[in-house]
Curated annotation (Swiss-Prot):
Per-repeat ranges for Sequence: 33-54, 60-81, 82-103, 115-136, 137-158, 159-180, 181-202, 203-224, 225-246, 247-268, 269-286, 287-308, 309-330
Family from the record: Belongs to the apolipoprotein A1/A4/E family.
GO MF term (any one): phosphatidylcholine binding
Keyword terms, alphabetized: Chylomicron, HDL, Lipid transport, Repeat, Secreted, Signal, Transport
Quaternary structure (record): Homodimer.
CC per GO annotation: cell surface; chylomicron; cytosol; extracellular region; extracellular space; high-density lipoprotein particle; synapse; very-low-density lipoprotein particle
Stated name of the protein: Apolipoprotein A-IV
Comment on protein domains: Nine of the thirteen 22-amino acid tandem repeats (each 22-mer is actually a tandem array of two, A and B, related 11-mers) occurring in this sequence are predicted to be highly alpha-helical, and many of these helices are amphipathic. They may therefore serve as lipid-binding domains with lecithin:cholesterol acyltransferase (LCAT) activating abilities.
């Protein structure tokens, strides 16, 4: 299912070679964004796509998303263009086919569960309550750690900055000798505090995923007696739900890590500036310390205010996804786009599998040749025989 999409993924992975700085998630994100934009209005997009400079589009796309890590090997664009043009012609048809398959699967589940509507509602309600109870400690812990670590950072750095300001006044005639050790120690303290912040605040994504798995397994067992004859379809739908919920866990970790990196990026130049000003005059150093002290308070408070709600927002998002799943199984589900989660799940699995193959076979200095569409399936089969067997894309 959606083989052409998978092949494009493999090709784009091959473009980057096996450079260590390019991860499978980065590649999958770029490819998935590309597919999503194209499939929003597939027919119109395909027609427009074939009229424009495909090479420039993809080059710009990868440059924006991956930066220097996406530098292409010479001549790769010429191989990519015919591949993508052929792919685009099949995209709309493939997407619609998968959409219909998932729609039929949901209809079969609704028909089977309809006589037990009250029990289904009760089961979901109980499961949502348990999910909230299981997730609450993570949100509380994240909030506590944010408050503790940001407060500790200020307690470590603010008094030290004030000590440096006092030392300046007492050592005007011997500024460099007296202040250089303090400035170096300030930088060490700052770096150490940032590392501790990362260590304590990075959410435990694997633990969150395990909680999600356990919660959904409990739900599956509770619904099993109500889905006799269609349990495989229920299992399949819940795989898609699990993928989306776990994706939220990964995104939470990414967001928190990004905020920590941004805080460090904002404050590090100010710390460096203090060191550089030690070689200058008293007035310049004093101003640099004042700027750092002021920005430390502002930036840390902004960080705390932004990150603190993320745990609770994550919990609400998971409960909402569970509620949306319940509605999909109900009589008034309306139009849904649940097929997209299956396409994305399969796409990412394919990227991960192929990246693993490249790491085992390829060299960072020797990018893999780009397969054309008609060659892709044969090449994938050859690779599978060499230890890695990618899973077939699911429908």
């Amino acid at each position: 299912m959606f083989l052409k999409a998978a092949v494009l993924t493999l090709a784009l992975v091959a473009i980057t070679g096996t450079r260590a700085e390019v991860t499978s998630d980065q590649v999958a994100n770029v490819v998935w964004d590309y597919f999503t934009q194209l499939s929003n209005n597939a027919k119109e997009a395909v027609e427009q796509f074939q009229k424009t400079d495909v090479t420039q589009q993809l080059s710009t796309l990868f440059q924006d998303k991956l930066g220097d890590a996406s530098t292409y090997a010479d001549g790769v664009h010429n191989k990519l263009v015919p591949f993508v043009v052929q792919l685009s012609g099949h995209l709309a048809q493939e997407t619609e086919r998968v959409k219909e398959e998932i729609k039929k699967e949901l209809e079969d589940l609704r028909d089977r569960m309809m006589p037990h509507a009250n029990k289904v509602t009760q089961t979901f309600g109980e499961n949502m309550q348990k999910l909230q109870e299981h997730l609450k400690p993570y949100a509380v812990d994240l909030q506590d750690q944010i408050n503790t670590q940001t407060q500790e950072m200020k307690l470590q750095l603010t008094p030290y900055i004030q000590r440096m300001q006092t030392t300046i006044k007492e050592n005007v005639d011997n500024l460099h000798t007296s202040m250089m050790p303090l400035a170096t120690n300030l930088k060490d303290k700052f770096n150490r505090n940032m590392e501790e912040l990362k260590g304590h605040l990075t959410p435990r994504a694997n633990e969150l995923k395990a909680t999600i798995d356990q919660n959904l397994e409990d739900l599956r067992r509770s619904l099993a007696p109500l889905t006799v004859g269609v349990q495989e379809k229920l299992n399949h739908q819940m795989e898609g739900l699990a993928f989306q919920m776990k994706k939220n866990a990964e995104e939470l970790q990414t967001k928190v890590s990004a905020k920590i990196d941004q805080l460090q990026k904002n404050l590090a130049p100010l710390v460096e500036d203090v060191q550089s000003k030690v070689k200058g005059n008293t007035e310049g150093l004093q101003k640099s310390l004042e700027d750092l002290n002021r920005q430390l308070e502002q930036q840390v408070e902004e960080f705390r205010r932004t990150v603190e709600p993320m745990g609770e927002m994550f919990n609400k998002a998971l409960v909402q996804q569970l509620e949306q799943f319940r509605q999909q199984l109900g009589p008034n589900s309306g139009e849904v786009e649940s097929h997209l989660s299956f396409l994305e799940k399969s796409l990412r699995e394919k990227v991960n599998s192929f990246m693993s193959t490249l790491e085992k076979k390829g060299s960072p200095d020797q990018p893999q040749a780009l397969p054309l569409p008609e060659q892709a399936q044969e090449q994938a089969q050859e690779q599978a025989q060499e230890q890695v067997q990618p899973k077939p894309l699911e429908s």
